Curated annotation (Swiss-Prot):
It comes from Rickettsia africae (strain ESF-5). This is Large ribosomal subunit protein bL27. The keyword Ribonucleoprotein applies. It comes from the Bacteria. The keyword Ribonucleoprotein applies. One of its GO terms (cellular component) is ribonucleoprotein complex. The gene is rpmA.
Amino acid sequence: MATKKAGGGSRNGRDSAGRRLGVKKTDGQYVIPGNIIVRQRGTKIHPGTNVGLGKDHTIFALIEGRVEFLTKRNHKIVNVKGIAST
């Protein structure tokens, strides 16, 4: 007879790494084309003018300019306002 009971494996004790989601550039910040503005799951924030939407719903800048967040009809929208060239 065994004097020690078989040790049951612990079924907890692990955690996945955070996904680093969220707003990466805030209102009024300067961006260049390709800069990521928001990383998100689903379209919590919708793309506006001069921004693109990636297949994973990442919003990124298409032009050089300043980031602008606004709310229209209960939708958060992000735009990039271009800088007037001199």
